[in-house]
Amino acid sequence: MLFRSADISGSVAAFARFTLMLVYAIQGQFSKVRSFVFIDGIDEVTDFFRGEEDIANAIHRVNTEADVVWVDGHSDYGHAFEVFWEKYGKDVGPKTTVLLLGDARNNYHASQAWVIKEIRQKARHVYWLNPEPKSYWNTGDSIVGDYGTHTDGVFRSEEHTSEL
């Protein structure tokens, strides 16, 4: 099973569009994919993509129907990950691969990196794709290193979203 969770906040708007297109493509190829989006809240959007022939409709539903704002709509990875763990952690198992997508810019909120550690202990693999250049990682409010220590790898996504 593949769990995919993507930041769709303003700081990664172009990347978010790319990741939603990726979700659409992956869900069309595999039967056991669950997709989540977050800002400071998190929501499962698997059904938004399932059986949808028009990716624009699926993305529109994510943008208008997904419950991803908890307080103020500024990224809070820690809170989103805690809610994920509370609601869906029981579904992560030894056959699960988790793909996390985002810049890890947390607006100086608590990282709650323990959640990623717990997920990694239960899952087969955990990977992180970050759209920012590596030179930006762990600068300012970026806490990708806090999370990365609990993954099987953090990679810069070689995005070309302007071409999409």
Task: List each language-model region with its residue ranges.
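Exposed acidic/Ser/Thr-rich ligand/metal-binding surfaces
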Residues: 78-125
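Von Willebrand factor type A / integrin I
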Residues: 117-162
